Structure formats: structure tokens, C-alpha cells
Amino acid sequence: MAEPTAASCVEGVPPSNRGQDARDTTPSWWRSVGPALITACVVFGPGSLLVSANIGASHGYQLLWLLVLTGILMGTYMTTAARIGVVGGATPCTLVAQRLGRPVAAVIGINLCLICGTFQFSNNLAVAAAAETLVPKLDARWILLGFNGLIIIFLFAAKQLYRFLERTMKIMVGLMLLCFVINVILARPSLLGIVRGFVPSWPEGVSLGVPRKIDGGIQDPMILIASLLGTTFSVAAAFYQGNLVREKGWMIKDYSRGIGDSVAGVCVLTGVSAIIMITAAKVIPGEPADNIGVLAESLRPLLRSVAHVFFCVGLFAVAMNPFLINAMIGGSILADGIGQPPKLSDRWPRRFTVLVMLAGMVVAMLALRTGQKPVKLIIFGQALTVLGNPLMAVTILWLANRKDIMGDRRNTVILNILGGLGLLVVVLMAVRVLMRLVLTLS
């Protein structure tokens, strides 16, 4: 059963990628990572950084174990999607279209593109906040206009977009790790407290209650816990891993390489989140921040001057990482869903990517001008995740268990158990978001 799949894997792989191992003189471990680092960069954005910092500030080291568990679930879905792309010989949307019809694939593509589009404005605001932290006198709106313009020019000028993107993300990941590791070393956290944080326990004052509307506002006792799960365990980013391994040109002979790449990406994601959580637990206990700009300012008097500079540089890297990748996920998955070529170098993914970027920039500039958040857009994006996240999780598990796609490499019992646990978490999160939407609109 695996032989036709292997043959199909060769189809559509650019000639430049075939026989790459024979010509490439770079270390094998360096070639074995790439797609998952791109995924890690889009998942660990400003929202993840802020959530990790606030959990550390509010609960100390006590929820490090939950971060590890969330990383395991994310790793399960990332490796599964990567295996689908490598063994199946096509992207997840293409495989869905071949078996369930183009309309089903289109629903997935349109939904994911709209989710990326509605939240792209927050990536713009994060870049603006990070730039203002480094250069306070600059007008954030002009920063956004120039930044988006440069990236759009680059999108259409670059010939090998994926290769450049992968190399850039490797550099950015290295920069993030360097900056935040220096910070946590200078902060001198309690090693015993960190070890205890990996032992499952529940913080005092945090209940398992549901969101409630009190005095016109919504109170959610598990908002930080839910945010940690939502920002670290991203089904949409995991789904895109199947596309990225196709961009890389990996085939069945690269099966173990795809798994190793996914593990490396998850380790980076959870590792950086843990470092931020530990640093905040030591430096700003009991002082959670509302946005990354406030977080940087709150750390200024507490970190040494050199450490604060490193933090701001790392912060800017975090803000920039998901800026382009989020838009590219939306653009390429939409093109893939409606039956257009999905590679980043193709025309339609680039056009849709620009559309997502422009929509996010316009909304962010309006928000900066008025000082008000686009509440209706946020509600719309949250409503899309209620449908989209469970749909993508089910799709990944369904594809990974089909013998006509995976052959002898179908999901094992352990992977299905972890995948089922992840699906349960995704469904519960969707129900929770739905409850908050009902309370908001009532």
C-alpha cells in the first residue's frame, strides 16, 4: 500500500529539491529543521508572550507542567500533519478535496483564511508597540505603512520565497533564544521553584467555573489558563505544517526528518514560553500587563539596562515573526482550498497573502487613530474559531488514519489517544469561546 504513495510523493517536487542531499554541504541537523520553526514562529507571537508573562506574574512557576502538556498536544498535531504531507504526497486540503470533494476543502481554506485575516490586525499592533518601545518618537501608523509596503514588495520580488523565509526564521529563533535566555539568567530565578513547577498542581483562586456576565462585564475564572491553551496549542498552525513540508520538498525518505523537525519546533515553542514565564515569575510577580508595550515598560526598572535592551530586541523579533507568516498561512491555504497551486512562490497565494496583510494593516491603523479595539472584528474571528479549530483537528486525525493515504504509517494507538485528547481540548475551548460570544452579544 505504501508504494503508490511513495511514488506520488515525487510528483510535484521541484527538480531543484531532488537529490538535494547529494549536493548540499550544510550539516544534516541544519537541513533537518525548517518547516516546524516557521510554525513555532507564528504560534509564539506577541499574544503567546503576553500570556506566558502574565501567567508567570500571576501564578509563578506553578503552571509550567501545563505548558509542557500543551506542548505535547501541539507536537502530536504538528508531527501528524507533517507525516500526512510527507507520506500522502500532497497538502492536507488537496487530500481532502480528492476524497470528500472541493467544497469541503474550500470551507477549510476560506475559514482559515478569514481567521488569519481577522487576527492580522493584532500582529500589526504588536509590531507598532514593539517599534514604539525601541524608538518612542516614531509615528506607529507610518511604521505600519512602511513595514507592510516593504514586505509586499519583497513578496513579489523574491524568487525562492520559502528558502528565504526558512533561513530568516532560523535567525529569528536564534535571536529570540539568545535574548530571552540572557534575560532569565540575569533574573536568577529559583531553581527549586522551577522544578516544583513541573509537578502538576492547581493555583489557589483559579476555579473551573464557566464565564459569567457580572455588572455588564464578562468574568472568566479560567481566562489565563484558556489563553495558554489557545495560544500554545494552535491547530491552524499545526494544519499548515502539512503544507510546509511540501514546500520543503520532503518525500518518504525524509519521513524521520519531518518528525524530528516537528519535535524541534515544539521544543523551541514550549522552551521560549517557559523562559518568559520563569522570567516574569521572578521579575514582576503580581503585576500582569495589558499589552507587550506595557510589559516592556514594567520590566525596564526591574531588569538591568543591558537585560532590558535584550528583552526589547527579543520582543521585536517576536512581533515580527508571525506578521508575514500568519498572512501567508491564510493566503496559501485559501488558494489550496479553492483548487489553486498552493506553493508560496505561486501567484494566487501571494495575492491572497497581500489581501490579508492589507486588511490587517487598515484595521490596525484605524484602531491606532481612534484608540478603540475593533470589537466586532474580534467577535467575528472568535466565532470562526468555534467552527474552524475542531474542523481542522478532525481533518488531521481523519487523514492520518486513512490507509489509502498513510499506508503502513497510519497513526498508532498512542498517537490517536493523544490526538483524541487534543481534539477534546479543542472542542472544550470552542465551547468556552461560544459561551463568551453569547454573553458578549446578549
Features from the language model and the residues they span:
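Membrane-interface "cap" regions at the ends of multi-pass membrane proteins
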Residues: 1-50, 174, 224-225, 250-256, ...
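Transmembrane-helix boundary/entry motifs in multi-pass membrane transporters
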Residues: 21-29, 60, 86-117, 134-140, ...
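Extracellular loop-to-transmembrane helix junctions
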Residues: 27, 54-79, 93-98, 102-106, ...
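Flexible loop linkers connecting adjacent transmembrane helices
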Residues: 52-56, 79-104, 129-135, 160-164, ...
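Extracellular/periplasmic helix-exit of transmembrane alpha-helices
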Residues: 75-87, 245-246, 267-294
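Hydrophobic transmembrane alpha-helices that form the core helical bundles
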Residues: 87, 105-137, 144-148, 319-338, ...
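Transmembrane alpha-helical segments of multi-pass small-molecule transport proteins
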Residues: 109, 134-158, 174-179, 346-363, ...
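Hydrophobic alpha-helical segments and their helix-loop junctions in multi-pass secondary transporters
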Residues: 174-213, 222-226, 231-242, 395-404, ...
